Structure formats: C-alpha cells, structure tokens
C-alpha cells in the first residue's frame, strides 16, 4: 500500500547499482528494474521491496519471489484498484517481531500472456489425449511459457538479484509465492527447482483449470506432484483458499492435494506444511492482503 515513507525507484538495463527513488511506499523502499529474459524473449518488469534500514545494514536477507508483482504494493495502479498491501503487512509483522526481515522480488505479469507464463508445463504430459474442448481452451497451447518463466527466475533473475541486493542465496532462505495461476507456478517452481526454492506459498491455487467440472487438469497436477514434489524433508508448503467467488470451486481439489502432500511427508508437526480455509474469502487481492500474514509468518517466522 503506497503511503508516506519509503520509496519506489526505477532503472533500465544495465544496472550499476540500485535505482533511485521514484514514488513512496508505506514502509521500506521499492526499486523498479527492467530485466531482459533470454528464456522468454521479453523484458520483464521487476519491483524489489527492501525494508527500512536496508541501506544502513550489512546483513543478508531472505527473499520471496512473487508473481503478479504489479499488484503487490500500489492499489492506485492496479486494474481493480486493489493490492496485496505487502509493504504495510510486512511492516506490521516486522514491528511486532513476528518474522525475519525479508526482501520481496515482485515479477510483473502481462495480461495477454499471464496464463501461459504461469502454466506448469511439465504437468500437461499427464493429461489424457482425449479431453474436453474446455481443457484445450484453458491450455491455450500456442502461448505456453511456464518452463521459460521458471527458468528466467532461477537462471537470470535470481543471479541478478543476488548480485544487486544483499540476499541470502541459500535454498532455505529463498521462497516463491503467488495466487491463482501464481499458486500453481509457485509449487511448480519448487518442484522443478528444489535446489533453489526451500518453500512455496500458494494462495487460492487454481487447481481446477476449467470451470466446467472437468477434472482432467486437476488430475494431471495431482499426478505431476505425486512424481515431482520434493519429499526430502527440507521443503515447506503453504496452501490456502477462500470460499466465495472463484475460490468456492477450489475446496475439493485443494483437499485432495493436501492429502497427497501429507502422504509425501509434509506435516504441521514437522513445520513443513500449513493450510488454511478463509471463510468468506474471495478470489481477489483484498482477500489475499487480509491473510497474506499467514504465509509470511509460515515462510519467515522466527524460529
């Protein structure tokens, strides 16, 4: 949420240092970068939030890579005039001593390519050859770039961020989080790159694919996760959903996925799993803003 303190800054390639201030954030600073993605053949807009005191510190910070970065901080610039209010929520958690102080890397999405960019491509091999027209329409196979997007984060964006910011590069300090299709990409990225991401936060995950009750996509994700989900005891997973609007369709698929995750050793007792049902929560940024403290505390909570 934009407010009176902190700043947003802007930079073009190449980058000698962090870009200067542009706008204000309620706490901390937001720096804007434009990073060329050879994997996707695009230039990707990146917003990096650094906490209060970052410039005067020599410490290294855990980092969360978040999808739909354009919706994280400033409701005045989003399509629906809502944001996750990440700067405000994190500022409160830090002030209350609830979390280790992080850096947030927000990866902007582009509406026309978002679905294809966040699609868990390798899960699609589990789809049946004969499937409904609705499933094929959902897949929109002419624009699938999920593998390229994930590779961009790991092979281009992360090295760049590690060089520009004082981040802890280790797996156990590097997390990925998003909602809806971003929830799918988060668990996918952790599964494809288990050596890079130590945990994933998945809010309102779009397990269902289509809206017609066809389970083909959900079944494919289940089969993919059964094979690829890390099960070494060193990874953690947060899963939630609301109960209204689009989220009202997610319950059965989410419960099935939670059962699978538990069968692979994730559990609350071990501190490797947290789940939540947001009664009345909708499929929108205001609902995610109201409960994002939960995955933040799970990912960053002080031990």
Predicted segments with their positions:
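C-terminal motif of bacterial Sec signal peptides marking the signal peptidase cleavage site
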Residues: 2-4
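Bacterial signal peptide processing site
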Residues: 6-9
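Non-catalytic cap/lid and distal C-terminal segments of serine-dependent acyl enzymes
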Residues: 11-303
């Amino acid at each position: 949420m934009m407010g009176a303190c902190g700043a947003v800054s802007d930079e073009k390639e190449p980058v000698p240092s962090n870009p200067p201030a542009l706008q204000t954030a309620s706490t901390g600073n937001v720096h804007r970068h434009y990073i060329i993605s050879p994997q996707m053949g695009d230039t990707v807009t990146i917003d990096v939030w650094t906490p209060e005191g970052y410039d005067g510190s020599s410490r290294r910070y855990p980092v969360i890579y978040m999808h739909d970065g354009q919706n994280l901080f400033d409701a005045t610039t989003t399509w629906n005039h809502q944001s996750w209010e990440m700067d405000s929520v994190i500022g409160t958690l830090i002030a209350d001593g609830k979390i280790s102080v992080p850096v947030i890397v927000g990866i902007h999405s582009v509406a026309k390519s978002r679905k294809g960019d966040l699609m868990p491509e390798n899960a699609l091999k589990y789809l049946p050859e004969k499937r409904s027209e609705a499933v094929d329409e959902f897949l929109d196979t002419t624009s699938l770039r999920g593998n390229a997007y994930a590779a961009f984060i790991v092979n281009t964006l992360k090295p760049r961020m590690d060089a520009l910011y004082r981040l802890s590069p280790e797996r156990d300090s590097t997390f990925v989080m998003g909602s809806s299709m971003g929830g799918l990409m988060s668990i996918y990225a952790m599964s494809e790159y288990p050596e890079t991401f130590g945990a994933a936060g998945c809010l309102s995950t779009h397990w269902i694919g289509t809206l017609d009750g066809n389970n083909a996509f959900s079944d494919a994700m289940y089969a993919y996760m059964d094979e690829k989900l890390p099960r070494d005891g060193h990874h953690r997973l947060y899963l939630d959903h609301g109960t209204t609007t689009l989220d009202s369709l997610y319950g059965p698929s989410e419960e099935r996925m939670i059962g699978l995750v538990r069968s692979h050793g994730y559990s609350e007792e071990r501190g490797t799993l947290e789940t939540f049902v947001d009664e009345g929560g909708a499929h929108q940024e205001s609902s995610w803003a109201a409960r994002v403290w939960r995955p933040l505390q799970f990912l960053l909570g002080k031990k």
